[in-house]
């Protein structure tokens, strides 16, 4: 049957009596079919709810749909839609009161999702605190601002910005999400930009180590501006292309309502997967060189490289696995899906904390610089206290004051 004909038949089944019942309940003025734009015509929305002919200016209520997307809903609650003064239906329909009726399995999953959300919030809060502390340490310790630590600093910065944007995304409510507001789409775009910069700075980490160890190229000759361009500038046109694709092909739900792995999303997910694969190649070569050539070496530079490689070996698979999990089917059984929910939530939310620990708090240069700064502060403080006490002691016949010394020197 033709879709338009089927839709017309369904609309015909929307009874005019329902609209008259609304009027009897006091929802609007009497219908005047002869008057211009005095009522809204009977129509069906995209969900399939029947909206009967209603008077202009009336707020019409209809029972929530019994089923939608295979989920059963509570039909004792109502959805609302306004018939505008010009005789047209408002495009926005209020389904906020409609709640699904959950069976035991759905209730169990709902509970696990709520717990996973708490884990997400906790992990992001811990990560932001650790990342900000690491950022301030790199900012304060100017003595360790070599190229390697500048790269760490930028990676930490991307995680801070990404986590902040994640919190902003959580503020988007269902109505804003469905109405596809411009500011909501901007938040999604900025969030995805920082996601891409995240992985490109991980690529810069791998590129730096590969250049220094495998290619035996002097790190002093590497240009910081080149790495800054790779980490911050290259992701920009990628996200612009993704935003254009979303605008023309999937301009709905604030641009993050689709399932992971959607075709338009591969515009930015593809480069991320590519740099992850390149980083794995880099690390394979780095480990091979360390195993063959640097095993017997004990120089301080080599030790630093080894520590950096260990950190990257831990972090890169960790970050790569958390991202690639979105493309993995956890399985049909309940245990696999529940484990997937918790495992993914934990790694996604705490990865900023792991970055701070491996690249800052466990960084030997950072710890040494902090100890030196602390000892310097202690020495400075311990010198000031005795001097202040000496200045506060009154002069006596048995002691020579600072004032008397000046007078003696003058004579």
Swiss-Prot record:
Sorted UniProt keywords: Cell membrane, Disulfide bond, G-protein coupled receptor, Glycoprotein, Membrane, Receptor, Signal, Transducer, Transmembrane, Transmembrane helix
Record CDD domains: 7tmB1_CRF-R2
Segments passing through the bilayer: 109-139, 147-171, 186-214, 222-249, 266-291, 303-327, 335-364
Designated name of the protein: Corticotropin-releasing factor receptor 2
Gene Ontology biological process terms, A to Z: adenylate cyclase-modulating G protein-coupled receptor signaling pathway; cell surface receptor signaling pathway; long-term synaptic potentiation
Disulfide bond annotation, renumbered to this chain: 14-50, 40-83, 64-98, 184-254
Keyword Signal: yes
Subcellular location: Cell membrane
PTM field: A N-glycosylation site within the signal peptide impedes its proper cleavage and function.
Its job: G-protein coupled receptor for CRH (corticotropin-releasing factor), UCN (urocortin), UCN2 and UCN3. Has high affinity for UCN. Ligand binding causes a conformation change that triggers signaling via guanine nucleotide-binding proteins (G proteins) and down-stream effectors, such as adenylate cyclase. Promotes the activation of adenylate cyclase, leading to increased intracellular cAMP levels.
Predominant localisation class: membrane
Domain notes: The transmembrane domain is composed of seven transmembrane helices that are arranged in V-shape. Transmembrane helix 7 assumes a sharply kinked structure.
Xref: InterPro entries: GPCR_2 (IPR050332), GPCR_2-like_7TM (IPR017981), GPCR_2_CRF2_rcpt (IPR003053), GPCR_2_CRF_rcpt (IPR003051), GPCR_2_extracell_dom_sf (IPR036445), GPCR_2_extracellular_dom (IPR001879), GPCR_2_secretin-like (IPR000832), GPCR_2_secretin-like_CS (IPR017983)
Membrane topology of this protein: Multi-pass membrane protein
Similarity annotation: Belongs to the G-protein coupled receptor 2 family.
Record text on subunit structure and interactions: Monomer. Interacts (via N-terminal extracellular domain) with CRF, UCN, UCN2 and UCN3. Has highest affinity for UCN, and considerably lower affinity for CRF, UNC2 and UCN3.
Highest rank taxon of the organism: Eukaryota
Species annotation: Homo sapiens (Human)
Gene Ontology, cellular component aspect: axon terminus; dendrite; plasma membrane
Signal peptide: 1-19
Residues listed as glycosylation sites in the UniProt record: 13, 41, 74, 86, 94
GO molecular function, one term: peptide hormone binding
Parts of the chain on the Cytoplasmic side: 140-146, 215-221, 292-302, 365-411
Positions on the Extracellular side per record topology: 1-108, 172-185, 250-265, 328-334
């Amino acid at each position: 049957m033709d879709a338009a004909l089927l839709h017309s038949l369904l609309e015909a089944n929307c009874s005019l009596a329902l609209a008259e019942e609304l009027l009897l309940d006091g929802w609007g003025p009497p219908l005047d079919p002869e008057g211009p734009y005095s009522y809204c015509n009977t129509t069906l929305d995209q969900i399939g709810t029947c909206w009967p002919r209603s008077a202009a200016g009336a707020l019409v209520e209809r029972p929530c749909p019994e089923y939608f997307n295979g989920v059963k809903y509570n039909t004792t609650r109502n959805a609302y839609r306004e018939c505008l003064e010009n005789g047209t239906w408002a495009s926005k329909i209020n389904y906020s009161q409609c709640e699904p009726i959950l069976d035991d399995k759905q209730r169990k999953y709902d509970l696990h999702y709520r717990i996973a959300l708490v884990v997400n919030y906790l992990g992001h809060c811990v990560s932001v605190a650790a990342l900000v502390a690491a950022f301030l340490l790199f900012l304060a310790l100017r003595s360790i601002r070599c190229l390697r630590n500048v790269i760490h600093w930028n990676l930490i910065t991307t995680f801070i910005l990404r986590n902040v944007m994640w919190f902003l995304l959580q503020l988007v409510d269902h109505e804003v999400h469905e109405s596809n507001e411009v500011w909501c789409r901007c938040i999604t775009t900025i969030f995805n930009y920082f996601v891409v910069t995240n992985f490109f700075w991980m690529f810069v980490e791998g590129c730096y180590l590969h250049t220094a160890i495998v290619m035996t190229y002097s790190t002093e000759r590497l240009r910081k501006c080149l790495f800054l361009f790779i980490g911050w500038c290259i992701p920009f046109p990628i996200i612009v292309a993704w935003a254009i694709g979303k605008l023309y092909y999937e301009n709905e739900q604030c641009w993050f309502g689709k399932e992971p792995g959607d075709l338009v999303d591969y515009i930015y997910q593809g480069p991320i997967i590519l740099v992850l694969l390149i980083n794995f190649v880099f690390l394979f070569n780095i480990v091979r060189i360390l195993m063959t050539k640097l095993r017997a070496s004990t120089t301080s530079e080599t030790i630093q490289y080894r520590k950096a490689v260990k950190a990257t070996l831990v972090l890169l698979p960790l970050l790569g696995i958390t991202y690639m999990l979105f493309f993995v089917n956890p399985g049909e059984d309940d245990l696999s899906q529940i484990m997937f929910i918790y495992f993914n939530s934990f790694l996604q939310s705490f990865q900023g904390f792991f970055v701070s620990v491996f690249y800052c708090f466990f960084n030997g240069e950072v710890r040494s610089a902090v100890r030196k700064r602390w000892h310097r502060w202690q020495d400075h403080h311990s010198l000031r206290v005795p001097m202040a006490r000496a200045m506060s002691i009154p002069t006596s016949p048995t002691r020579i004051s600072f004032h008397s010394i000046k007078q003696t020197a003058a004579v």
